[in-house]
């Protein structure tokens, strides 16, 4: 089976991860002790994508839980689902990273990374046919960003041909937890551009807005926010875990969504989202779900897709959905909003259909968009980064852990390059840019000989 090993790093990553395992366990009819008490054979049919079957029919998540301080992991262990996880898959340091990327990446995290990799290796060896890894972490703190990216690059080294997907919580525009977020985030993006296959960008402020405005929760708490994210996480892998008419997996996802290797930062959305009292009054149709998931208010990252253009997009429908209707809706979206899509990638929306709806729903859809509007996040973080880096503010915390200023400069220019690539492809049109594209894509090898000329010669 196509197994996925899940890694959660740092406080934010562990809280999202814990919620994700609650949601997935409920879908597969697995209770908090790992025993199966579901109602349908389909629930167990491919449960091994995320679970290992232990002795006595117990299902154990393929999860590795990592943090540089024991607090959050202890809370998960003591919580209602603590008995679900394998006890030796918890790897905790004692000192914490103190919101310092350098501590997570070079000092404290580097000391712990080998013991984490041992657990990851053991989980990977327990798989028949490992599909890839998914990492949940935040980019603003120390452990999730510093140690999370260290793990991503180490796993990349050891498993170069497996998929690497990360669910990365970006710093929010208005809500800032720590003053050094721009540093941590920029240094992390620098790593993720090189080592990840797909990065799903999430931010707390967008999640707050969805909870507050759409779900009408007056005081959203982190569990509410994390539930939104886990809905998408479960939707993306649903067709690996349940039978469907149009299947998808992590590799198909990347092949269909990443037109250029560096542009793998996606925004995600989920439908149906409606306040508790309103649900009964809404029709759930494919058209309704499609409309909602393409709605800018539905995006879980704080950037407006109307400010850019979609390179590609992917929709994951669940429930009893007509494939024909899905195809028609995808076509209609592209025809109606043609200005929002790049014209030199025809049929840019991929759809997948899974027959089993999530718990408590008759139909749902998860959305992934590769839009040039994602540059808003990088621009925002970049401007905060330059403002502080110009004055070398807070830099001694990083250089004290052995980092060099050069690394900051490199990370900054890598992120700026990413923004200018996004701008270049947004502005490109079919006619005018063909020659320029050939040059941009590195088709010019020596002098002005193209690949074809070279081989012909």
From Swiss-Prot:
SMART domains: Tubulin, Tubulin_C. Mg(2+) binds at residue 69. It is found in: Cytoplasm, Cytoskeleton. Its cofactor is Mg(2+). GO terms for biological process: microtubule-based process. GTP binds at residues 11, 69, 138, 142-144, 204, 226. InterPro entries: Beta-tubulin_BS (IPR013838), Beta_tubulin (IPR002453), Tub_FtsZ_C (IPR008280), Tubulin (IPR000217), Tubulin/FtsZ-like_C (IPR037103), Tubulin/FtsZ_2-layer-sand-dom (IPR018316), Tubulin/FtsZ_GTPase_sf (IPR036525), Tubulin_C (IPR023123). GO terms for molecular function: GTP binding; GTPase activity; metal ion binding; structural constituent of cytoskeleton. Keywords: Cytoplasm, Cytoskeleton, GTP-binding, Magnesium, Metal-binding, Microtubule, Nucleotide-binding. The keyword Magnesium applies. Residues 431-457 are annotated as: Disordered. It holds the Pfam family Tubulin_C. GO terms for cellular component: cytoplasm; microtubule. Gene3D superfamilies: Helix hairpin bin, Tubulin/FtsZ, C-terminal domain, Tubulin/FtsZ, GTPase domain. Tubulin is the major constituent of microtubules, a cylinder consisting of laterally associated linear protofilaments composed of alpha- and beta-tubulin heterodimers. Microtubules grow by the addition of GTP-tubulin dimers to the microtubule end, where a stabilizing cap forms. Below the cap, tubulin dimers are in GDP-bound state, owing to GTPase activity of alpha-tubulin. Dimer of alpha and beta chains. A typical microtubule is a hollow water-filled tube with an outer diameter of 25 nm and an inner diameter of 15 nM. Alpha-beta heterodimers associate head-to-tail to form protofilaments running lengthwise along the microtubule wall with the beta-tubulin subunit facing the microtubule plus end conferring a structural polarity. Microtubules usually have 13 protofilaments but different protofilament numbers can be found in some organisms and specialized cells. Belongs to the tubulin family. PANTHER family: TUBULIN. This is Tubulin beta chain. It comes from Porphyra purpurea (Red seaweed). The lineage of its organism: Eukaryota, Rhodophyta, Bangiophyceae, Bangiales, Bangiaceae. The gene is TUBB1.
